[in-house]
Amino acid sequence: MAKIALPRKFFGRRFEVLEPPYLLSIPKNSFENFVQLKVNPYKRKNVGLEHIFRTSFPFKDPDENFILEYLGYEIGDWECNRCGYKPKDDLLGGWDVDCPQCGAKLVYKEKFTPEECKLKGLTYSAPLRVMLQLKAKTKNGYREFPPKKVYFGEIPLMTETGSFIINGTERIIINQLIRSSGVFFDEKEEKQKDATITRILYRGSIIPDKGSRVEFELSGATDLISARIDRKKLSATAVLRAFGLETAYDILKYFYEDVRKFIVKDKYLYDAQTGEEFTPEDLEHHYIFAIIKFRGKLVGFASSKERDFIEERYIEEWEDLVRLLDDDRIEVLSVTAVPRDVVIKSPYGKSLIDTLANDTSPKDVDKRSPVKVPAEYTLRDYGLMEMYKRLRHIEAITMEIDSVIERARIFFNVFFRDLKRYDLSRVGRVKINAKVHRIPKVLKPADVDLLDQLPPLALAEDYGEYKAGTRVTKDLLKELFKQYKEIKVKDYTEDEARFILPIDLVNILKYLIDLRHGRVKKDDIAHLGNRRVRSVGELLENQARLGIAKMEKVFRDRSAVINPEQPDLKPQDFINPRYVTTAITDFLKTGQLSQYLDNTNPLSELTHKRRLSALGPGGLTRESAKFEIRDVHPSHYGRICPIETPEGQNIGLVTSPTVYARVNEYGFLITPYRKVENGKVTDKIEWLAAYEEENYVIAQSTPTDEEGRLKAEFILARHKNDIRLVKPEQVEYIDVSPRQVISPSSSLIPFLEHDDANRALMGSNMQRQAVPLIFTQAPLIGTGMEKKIARDSHAVVVAKRGGVVEEVDSSKIIIRVNPEEINFDDPLDIGIDIYELRKFQRTNQKTCVNQRPIVRKGEKVEKGQIIADGHSTDRGELALGKDVLVAFMPWRGYNFEDAIVISERLVKEDVYTSIHIEELEVEARETKVGEEEITRQIPGVPERALAHLDEHGIVRVGTYVKPGDILVGKVTPKGETRLTPEEKLLQAIFGEKTRDVKDASLRCPPGVEGIVIDVQVFTRKGTGKKDMLAEKVEREELEALEQELEKKKNLIITGRDKVLKGLVLGRKVEKDAKVGRKTVKKGTVIDEKVFEEFVNYILGRPENFFEDEDLIRKIREIAERTRTQIEMLNKVYEEKKETLLKRRDLPPGVITLVKVFIANKRKIKVGDKMAGRHGNKGVISVVLPVEDMPFLPDGTPVDIVLNPLGVPSRMNVGQILETHLGWAAKELGKKIGEMIEKGRDRKAITEYLKEIFAIGDKDGENAKFIEEFLNSLSEEEFWSVVRDYAERGIPMATPAFEGAEEDAIKELLKKAGLPENGKTTLYDGRTGEPFDFEVTVGYMHMLKLIHMVDDKIHARATGPYSLVTQQPLGGRAQFGGQRLGEMEVWALEAHGAAYTLQEMLTVKSDDVEGRTKVYEAIVKGKYTYTPGIPESFKVLVRELKALGLNVKCLNGEEKPCDEVEVKEEEEK
């Protein structure tokens, strides 16, 4: 049987209500939405690339001579497997597209696999082709050219594991957490002239996804409202008018109840709605605004001729209105009045009246208000004009007012009504609606008139022929209400809903006034309702948009010089198509959010792909991010992990989503809750965003009774960022799982609830630094998340389809697929799945990936089953470290301050041994003086130094190399010397002379040693000549390809014969069949022997053997299918061969590239860093012989001795609980081993395991589970599982916040025959004496981290020097020295170590002559030296001379000691 993960004893709930979602869904779904690769190209949704193309096209030049229209796009090469058809210009290839010739589905043809791209240093990508149609203007309209597919370049694709491969390196795009578009309200202190008074300025900002920010400010000092667009201040009413609220009446009717509009006739006022007659005196206690018409001039414009104007004016008293009515020069058009008592009682107060009054009060000498425009225009045009003047910085206008208004209208439409320039985005619309509009979820017949006061709405469900998403109108509602009593609606987020609407401005002002009066709170920028995730798809979309903008500019430029009458125009003549893919590729290569993938182990890879960052373009900077943004926020609950974040300057800015978090369609993090109805928990799951959950009472995951009712009398619940005790009936939702609040990394820490947060942070971060070990071991004490993380990180191999294991070896697994899972429509589906395993591959961090099969030949495999382990996994579970026996006690001072004492057993038995792979490469290039060459003929190198190289000068695989060894021999031509006539004659007679070359070989760098495990050679194509090396490489690759082809053919034939045997074995031949010279007699039974001999004849001519038509048809189908499959395989082989023979494109100037991979086995040693999962880290201080380690009463020596003082102050008690439980788990396993040795039967062992699993099991789930599991096993499987338990111990899972309780741990220790306090007497390994006090002992999962001493230790005698100062370079990478700074000099001075100090500052640093002399003296065995003058002193002298200061250094005899040397150098 397969090596299955042993069932764990669970302390929490074994079965979750909701399984955590796929952990890489955030980046993968985002990219899939961007490219929509698995969607029919003719049915793509309007998102991602499709949305960019649809909104950017058609391109039009200014004169509209040419129009370029978009019809669709295809990604990748597509082909029909059945007939070989490839889509032409008139058909887009893609998913679910039918072949026009034979009707089969088109199939995607991958040029290179991700593995090949990594190997060859290529980008994993596919061609992007866009179908465009060009139209050219003619006298009779537009001439349409046939659609063309234009090649836009290669678009990088995401691999199955969620990363990108760019030039052979694996990279990922970090998810960005940015401020959402929408409306935000805040308040800040307003600057006052009098510094003693502070007033608050209240602000509401509309932040679009694209375009200008519109802000309204309400001054706490004056109660007046002003507006800002792009920070430029202008009148608030001007902005309102520009957006469509033209008059005072249009504005005020939304704020006050009794607003009346009057029409003026014969100096009497008539109510516009009722027709009732009023006199001016009736408006005595009213605020009055009048629209008047008069003849006059407008100052400040080019023309000052008299014309009719309309103006809106604030009338302070009713008598002023009488005067206006009596004035023959003025015509009062309408009057708006609001009763003063209505304004006083209104929640919106006088702010709006005062603002309108302020803007429309007479300001100049002739008592005219500024709100006026020519009579043929409207007051909206006044608002547009004001906005245009302010935003375009126009002070004195030299144009006619008509031109200004016309321009202002165009300006507004471009600025605020063009999706290319201004877009709130779907997110912005949803956020505005949620913030300031009260949108009902359901509309009833009485609500029809409400539509005018709401932003656009859409149907939330299908209603008959009207689909969900259809825009709601009054007519539609009236029609639907004939059939339905209520209609469910949602936000409409397309068309004009993407712009600012008048009703938005009204409700924003209402909210702003409410904020001023303390009825609502200001927005919290750290709240996750105001921050959204921009994942990889959206980030790439933004880049593509920039590329399209450049392309459109090129289109306009080229259109100007092309004649529309030309006969053969193509889209390529007008655009540079590479802009889009170049923008995307550049972002992946150099973008701020594009990072080198951290794949130290599967957990680090998974976490890196899920990471959220507040940094990057459009985000925050480390310097500007305040504490509030970095801090844990209540809205993070269930969305962002409060534990996992870096410790440095990025703390709180780089975070991780929780296990259950997902991203909704608008980019907000959502988390699942179970619905609670009347105190009863239902199984209905709802996903809520942070801004949605605020209105609900949500309880944490709480125990329920059998009926699902909440047990407790009072329950701790959250409501509006507040935590309080509520009754069960008040609870509306309940958490899905206690692990809902933490990330995958944190969820791997057992007893997390007993660790201090700071240490848990270190624990979750250090697990990502654990090095994959040679022998992996899943933790004895886990949390139950190990399997989920191993699977979702793609470290393990999972069966795509069920079947039987046909063949298995260390490098591949072949599974014959179940017949019902084979796709018979695809000729390439041969019913065989081949899984190539990754063997000893290097990761970005130089760790080793190695996959191992865990299934056997002949075994049945289910779809989704784990069939191979990867690095840091054990039987499909994550295994980052090893369970070792630890003791908490001091040991002779060696574990002082977190140092760790380890046993030599861990070194000898390779417990913590890991493999590290170094990749070195060398290029042979073309130089000005000739070509470099990879060769074994290296001048000046003795033969023994070349012993390990092959005939081409490349190191042999399997060689053990040390620093300084030649890995690849390379020679570079020196500059050609001028030949003498004699040499020229000799050269002419004897041909080419031996070239003058120098050694430029690749040598093993310092600090690198190990075994060469692989050598890869790449040669350039199209050079016209092939050297022996290139031919050898080509030959080997072709042989591998042929072997693969033969293997697949054999598998097809084996499968064919298997199916055929099922049809004909045991049947009789129904007529005499002549086969060559032989005859198969009628009635002959077809057995194995006959079948083997005549199988090909039966397939070729079944009618010669049988008369059953149905059987003959089936045999022919099998033969035809096999023939088609072998033909297709041959075709694929020929394509691969052609690609291979083209050979790899190397960078310009490179002839040959050789890569050498050196594997180094690193045992654990002094200086390596180790850690537990609880933030308990330390460096190994000593490796003790096993016999010196403290030992248990039974003689077992401990593996690691930790300092007990590392626990109390760090408050990570989880490690102690893990140690106790680990000891119990191990000893219980030994007890089972003893039972096996005593020959106890299956029943007794099952009962014993049931007893163990029942401890701490409140609802009996565990005991029932283990009994059912063991009873389901065959005899062989049962004893295999039980022996594993005996050898490994009983694995347990203590999930976070549901961990094992103290009583359960004590009971398990007791069951294992161990002391309940988890302590025992230890004996000193050196003296054999018992220690005075009992010591805490047990098993803990310890990790070896990537911070290894071999990467850090460094020593230098001589090496490279800086050119100017002649001092040694710095750093290990440069093989540099150690800097001796001022403080070190002072220390040596203080010690009086004059000679030491002198040599440090001279011969050991930058005394060029002195250091040479010292070296010579040491070689001769003499140990004296005379220091010279340091180079840095000479540099100082030269710098002073450059300043015009002649410096003389005088010795005791008053002779210049420096000048001679300086002069000598100057003469040179």
Curated annotation (Swiss-Prot):
Any Gene Ontology CC annotation: DNA-directed RNA polymerase complex
The entry's keywords: DNA-directed RNA polymerase, Nucleotidyltransferase, Transcription, Transferase
One Pfam family hit: RNA_pol_Rpb2_2
Molecular function GO labels: DNA binding; DNA-directed RNA polymerase activity; ribonucleoside binding
SUPFAM superfamilies in alphabetical order: beta and beta-prime subunits of DNA dependent RNA-polymerase
Listed GO biological process terms: DNA-templated transcription
Catalysed reactions, semicolon-separated: RNA(n) + a ribonucleoside 5'-triphosphate = RNA(n+1) + diphosphate
PROSITE patterns, per database record: RNA_POL_BETA
Coiled-coil segments: none
Protein EC: 2.7.7.6
Function: DNA-dependent RNA polymerase catalyzes the transcription of DNA into RNA using the four ribonucleoside triphosphates as substrates.
Assigned protein family: Belongs to the RNA polymerase beta chain family.
PANTHER family per record: DNA-DIRECTED RNA POLYMERASE I SUBUNIT 2
Complex and partners: The RNAP catalytic core consists of 2 alpha, 1 beta, 1 beta' and 1 omega subunit. When a sigma factor is associated with the core the holoenzyme is formed, which can initiate transcription.
Official protein name in the record: DNA-directed RNA polymerase subunit beta
Organism name: Aquifex aeolicus (strain VF5)
Gene: rpoB
